[in-house]
From Swiss-Prot:
InterPro entries: UPF0728. Belongs to the UPF0728 family. This is UPF0728 protein C10orf53 homolog. Pfam families: UPF0728. It comes from the Eukaryota. It comes from Mus musculus (Mouse).
Length: 93
């Protein structure tokens, strides 16, 4: 995938530490930072599927995971899921 691809980051609601279920982006910060560092344009899209994160490139889902498995905040450098997602976007056609 060329640099500066458009990546749609679809994310669902989740419950954090007993709080109500809602869409939150705190756990997406590292993933966004890693993709932005590679020069990709990121579009956030809320979905209704609980706990789900999907990366869509050229209308194809190239990566998905449970949002609660992503590290909270940070730059994503030490999160293995962020690296896995970055590679999936780079390998997308």
């Amino acid at each position: 995938m060329p640099a500066q691809a458009v990546v749609t980051l679809r994310y669902g609601p989740y419950s954090a530490v007993g709080l109500s279920v809602e869409h939150r982006t705190y756990r997406l910060q590292g993933l966004q930072a890693v993709l932005a560092k590679d020069g990709h344009q990121i579009i956030l899209e809320q979905i209704e599927d609980w706990n789900l994160v999907e990366l869509v490139v050229n209308e194809e889902t190239v990566f998905q995971c449970d949002i609660q498995e992503l590290e909270f905040g940070g730059d994503g450098k030490l999160d293995p899921l962020c690296e896995e997602a970055r590679i999936a976007v780079l390998n997308a056609f």
